[in-house]
Amino acid sequence: MDRCCQRATAFACALRPTKLIDYEEMFRGAMQARAMVANPDQWADSDRDQVNTRHYLSTSMRVALDRGEFFLVYQPIIRLADNRIIGAEALLRWEHPTLGTLLPGRFIDRAENNGLMVPLTAFVLEQACRHVRSWRDHSTDPQPFVSVNVSASTICDPGFLVLVEGVLGETGLPAHALQLELAEDARLSRDEKAVTRLQELSALGVGIAIDDFGIGFSSLAYLPRLPVDVVKLGGKFIECLDGDIQARLANEQITRAMIDLGDKLGITVTAKLVETPSQAARLRAFGCKAAQGWHFAKALPVDFFRE
């Protein structure tokens, strides 16, 4: 008896944002994309669910902060000359009781909108400074520093300078062991309030870093205007070091030029999102001083640095 078999094939994919540093998050996105294709009727309602979830997160953040649901993990920053840890970037996580561990991309924009950015930053600063002070008490050379991400709006908050001074005083951390990492923002070089605040922080001895330099709003115009100590290169600059030969050669020239410029200006260039041995080797050959990324270590719990 003749029988007819029908088969259907469905394809789905999840895009990987340039700044993504957690492969588990990318895997969850791929699995969700597959589920959406397999059962589109179910996911037709998911847009409404996502709106509800965003609202739920927004309204529950303050309670979560009071309950201690936020915590920090740290991605080591490596000195390329000898592969030793010289510092770490503090990364915020939310251990939600029902949604699991949430990365900042799920809630930071909510914090910006509901006025919780400064309280969250205060939490991160206090925890990070306390942790790195403990590490420094148990390490010899090099003495580690901690890098804390801060938004332009938080920098401009009237109480931010006093907050930083207070945290440094309470924890006993030397100011030079704290680095404030600023996301690219056009306001940084235009807003006199932001420029003045960064100069005041620099006068305290706090390091100033510009994240994802040269990719978005950030440009060479930042350098003479702001007291910059570190610029971070990431995204395509690093990714293309493993690309096809045409893209690789062009990015090598740009990366070399930025490292050379940093040396001439007394600015440390830190490569981020370094994921392969060949990327690390090229950066080392170019004279890059520091790097971070999955090739060296993923984000680690605080206990790792206490061992």
Swiss-Prot record:
<dbReference type="Pfam" id="PF00563">
    <property type="entry name" value="EAL"/>
</dbReference>
<feature type="transmembrane region" description="Helical">
    <location>
        <begin position="203"/>
        <end position="223"/>
    </location>
</feature>
<protein>
    <recommendedName>
        <fullName>Uncharacterized protein Rv1357c</fullName>
    </recommendedName>
</protein>
<dbReference type="InterPro" id="IPR050706">
    <property type="entry name" value="Cyclic-di-GMP_PDE-like"/>
</dbReference>
<dbReference type="GO" id="GO:0071111">
    <property type="term" value="F:cyclic-guanylate-specific phosphodiesterase activity"/>
</dbReference>
<keyword id="KW-0812">Transmembrane</keyword>
<feature type="transmembrane region" description="Helical">
    <location>
        <begin position="158"/>
        <end position="178"/>
    </location>
</feature>
<dbReference type="GO" id="GO:0009214">
    <property type="term" value="P:cyclic nucleotide catabolic process"/>
</dbReference>
<feature type="domain" description="EAL">
    <location>
        <begin position="54"/>
        <end position="307"/>
    </location>
</feature>
<keyword id="KW-0472">Membrane</keyword>
<dbReference type="GO" id="GO:0005886">
    <property type="term" value="C:plasma membrane"/>
</dbReference>
<keyword id="KW-1003">Cell membrane</keyword>
<dbReference type="InterPro" id="IPR001633">
    <property type="entry name" value="EAL_dom"/>
</dbReference>
<dbReference type="InterPro" id="IPR035919">
    <property type="entry name" value="EAL_sf"/>
</dbReference>
<keyword id="KW-1133">Transmembrane helix</keyword>
<dbReference type="GO" id="GO:0051701">
    <property type="term" value="P:biological process involved in interaction with host"/>
</dbReference>
